[in-house]
C-alpha cells in the first residue's frame, strides 16, 4: 500500500487509521494516532462538516495532522469507496449512537469480508447492545458522567457537578486508542481482526472506581468534597494561602509528623487516634480530622504560596500552586519541556497550544500539518485507493463526495 504524502515519524509510522465521528470523543482517539505518526483519515459528512469546525480555535489542535475525506459512506458508490478504503486500513474507529453502522448495513462481518485483519473500534454512549431504553440514545460528556456514577461524586457537598472540560470524551477517546493498539498487537499475532465495543458510561464507571468500591463492598458512599478538599483525607486537596491557592497531599509518616509540629499539633502524635506510623489522616473517622483542617487552614492563610512551597519542599510534602492559564506559558517547567508550542494553520496563521504528549525519546511525534479544510484530501485519498479523476468527479456529481473548492 502506498501512503498519502506526509513525513515519516513517530512509533506508529506506516499505520493507516480511519475514523468517523464528530466533536471530541472519537476524534480524540484519531488525534492521538496522528500525533504519534500514523496516517489518519478523518471522514466527514458531504453536506455538513463536523460541528467542531464552528469553534474558533480548538479544532486547530484536535484536527491537526489529519487527512480530510468528505464521503457519504452509507450510500451506493460512496459505500463502495468506503469499503475499498477499509481494504488498506489497519484501524477503523467510529463514534455514533449504539450499533448505528450495523443498522445501516455496515456490520463487522461486512468490514472483515473486505479486510479480515481490520481492527474496528465502536465508541458510543451506552454500547453496541443492552436494553432498547438506552442502547440507541445519544450521549455526550455530561450524559456519560451522569449515567456512570462519576458526576454524582464530583462537585460540592451542596450539589453534584460534572467534571470539565469534557472529561468523559477524553477518557473515552484515549480508551479507544489504547484498546485499538492492544487489538492490533493481537491481530498481528493471529491474523484475525477484532471488534471493540467502547461504552462511554463504562469508561467513566471504571474511572470513578476509587470511592465506589467502598459502596459495592460494604455500602459506604463517600461524601462529596467541601471547597475542593479531599472527601476522605485531611490535608489533601485545595487550600488558600495568603496570596492564592495551592493543592497539597499530606501523605507519609515523616510528612505528617513535621507538618503537625509546624501547625501546633505535635501533641497529637502517638495518641490512640493518631498512632505512630500514621500515613494518612481520615477526616471523618479520625476525631481530630476537623481540627487538623482548622489548624492547617489557619497556618496556610498566614503564609504566601512561595513560603509554603519552600517549607513543604523541605518536608517532602507534595504541593503545587494552582496556576492560571496565563501563567502556564512563562512557567519554567513548561518552557524547559516546550509543553506549549506553535504550528502553522492551513491558511498560514500561527496557532498556539499543547505540544505532543507523551514524549517518545527515540521516535518522537511531531506536528506536520494544521487542520485540513472540509474535503481537502478527498481526491488524494480516492486516488490512493485506485479511483481515477473521472471516478472521483462522478462521486462528486452524485453528491456522494466533496472535494476541496
Curated annotation (Swiss-Prot):
It is found in: Cytoplasm. CoA binds at residues 97, 104. It holds the Pfam family CoA_transf_3. The keyword Zinc does not apply. Pathway: Amine and polyamine metabolism; carnitine metabolism. HAMAP family: CaiB. This is L-carnitine CoA-transferase. The gene is caiB.
Amino acid at each position: 500500500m502506498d501512503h498519502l504524502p506526509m513525513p515519516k515519524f513517530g512509533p506508529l509510522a506506516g499505520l493507516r487509521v480511519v475514523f468517523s465521528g464528530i466533536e471530541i470523543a472519537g476524534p480524540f482517539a484519531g488525534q492521538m494516532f496522528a500525533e504519534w505518526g500514523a496516517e489518519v483519515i478523518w471522514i466527514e459528512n458531504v453536506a455538513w462538516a463536523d460541528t467542531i469546525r464552528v469553534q474558533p480555535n480548538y479544532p486547530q489542535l484536535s484536527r491537526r495532522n489529519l487527512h480530510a475525506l468528505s464521503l457519504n459512506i452509507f450510500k451506493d458508490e460512496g459505500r463502495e469507496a468506503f469499503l475499498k478504503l477499509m481494504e488498506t486500513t489497519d484501524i477503523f474507529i467510529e463514534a455514533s449512537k449504539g450499533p448505528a453502522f450495523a443498522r445501516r448495513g455496515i456490520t463487522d462481518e461486512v468490514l472483515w469480508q473486505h479486510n479480515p485483519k481490520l481492527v474496528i473500534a465502536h465508541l458510543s454512549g451506552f454500547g453496541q447492545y443492552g436494553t432498547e431504553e438506552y442502547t440507541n440514545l445519544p450521549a455526550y460528556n455530561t450524559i456519560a458522567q451522569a449515567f456512570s456514577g462519576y458526576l454524582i461524586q464530583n462537585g460540592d457537598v451542596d450539589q453534584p457537578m460534572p467534571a470539565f472540560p469534557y472529561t468523559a470524551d477524553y477518557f473515552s477517546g484515549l480508551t479507544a486508542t489504547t484498546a485499538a493498539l492492544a487489538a492490533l498487537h493481537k491481530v498481528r499475532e493471529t491474523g484475525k481482526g477484532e471488534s471493540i465495543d467502547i461504552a462511554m458510561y463504562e469508561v467513566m464507571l471504571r474511572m470513578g472506581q476509587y470511592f465506589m468500591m467502598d459502596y459495592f463492598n460494604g455500602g459506604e458512599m463517600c461524601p462529596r468534597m467541601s471547597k475542593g478538599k479531599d472527601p476522605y483525607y485531611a490535608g489533601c486537596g485545595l487550600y488558600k494561602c495568603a496570596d492564592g491557592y495551592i493543592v497539597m497531599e499530606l501523605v507519609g509518616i515523616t510528612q505528617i509528623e513535621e507538618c503537625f509540629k509546624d501547625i501546633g499539633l505535635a501533641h497529637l502524635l502517638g495518641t490512640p487516634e493518631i498512632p505512630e506510623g500514621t500515613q494518612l489522616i481520615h477526616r471523618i473517622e479520625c476525631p481530630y480530622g476537623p481540627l487538623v483542617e482548622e489548624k492547617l487552614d489557619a497556618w496556610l492563610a498566614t503564609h504566601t504560596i512561595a513560603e509554603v512551597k519552600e517549607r513543604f519542599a523541605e518536608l517532602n510534602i507534595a504541593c503545587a500552586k494552582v496556576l492560571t492559564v496565563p501563567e502556564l506559558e512563562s512557567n519554567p517547567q513548561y518552557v524547559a519541556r516546550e509543553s506549549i508550542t506553535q504550528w502553522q494553520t492551513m491558511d498560514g496563521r500561527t496557532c498556539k497550544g499543547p505540544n505532543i504528549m507523551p514524549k517518545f525519546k527515540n521516535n518522537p511525534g511531531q506536528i506536520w500539518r494544521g487542520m485540513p479544510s472540509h474535503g481537502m484530501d478527498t481526491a488524494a485519498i480516492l486516488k490512493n485507493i485506485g479511483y481515477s479523476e473521472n471516478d472521483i468527479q462522478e462521486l462528486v456529481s452524485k453528491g456522494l463526495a466533496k472535494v476541496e473548492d
